[in-house]
Amino acid sequence: MKPSRAIVLGAVQGPTELLPVSSSAHLPLIPWLVGWDEDGRDPELQKSFEVSLHAGAAAALLIGQRRVIAEELRSFDARKASVLALSFLPPAVCGLALERPIERRLGGPLSTAIGLLAGAAAMVVADRRPQLRDRGRATAADGLALGLAQAAALAPGISRNGATLTAARWRGFTRQHSNLLSRTVALPVIVGAAILKGVRLRRRGLPEEQRSPFAAGTATSFASTLASQELIRLVERDSALWPYAAYRAGLAGMVLGRIWRRRRRLRSSHEQPMRVASPASGDGSLAAGNGSPGRVSSPAGSRRKSG
């Protein structure tokens, strides 16, 4: 990957990390939509790059939200510990067990578009639930629901932020406290994923030519997330999730439309054999004795076969 492309993706990471629109969808879809030639990329290395962007965003959140974090730590108790632990265990277990199969089978544009649509539908449904609770009343069951949501967000397009916001609203929390819960439970998972990928990268080694893109992308992700902190308050103020659901559906529609057009062009290219007039019939039908496009059977050859 070129450093310039890493910088573009790092700049996208900040706002998409703070909004429930799935940064995990934007990172692979942008190169695909704009036509960057990444066919020879290593999937494991690509995923490590994405996690490095998440790590940059997490570092920016630790700085930008330090007052909120300090307040949480001052009031930390056994109940909050149980909520945090139960929100961490499902994504940790599923990540260790299913990370590689998910990367191999669910990393394509089609599965990402499906994830975007599924997340959008869940957000619209959750928005209709009553929202009366505050985070001070969160229980172990709430922590487990948030953990299962984060486990589901391992699939591209679902969005960790969107999944936890949806789960919190489904459990009846207000939009402000849903956002606070979402950010609180996400940080340990992001940091844990970054550590896991860091250990794997250390074992296999980072290619020399990839060090500059990794550094540039991580630094840009940190800066863009730090500069986008106002988006957190935007999500807190919004009374509905449907605008984000509409954006996700629009992006998914764009991806599905391009997939359909590509398949249509491919099908057309295979269904346009050369049409020639048969000397025997003169009716302009295909004269391809073996069914292959553009091959013409001679009358002599036909007589030899029939004899």
Model-derived features: positions:
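Multi-pass membrane proteins that catalyze or facilitate reactions on polyprenyl-/lipid-phosphate substrates
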Residues: 1-307
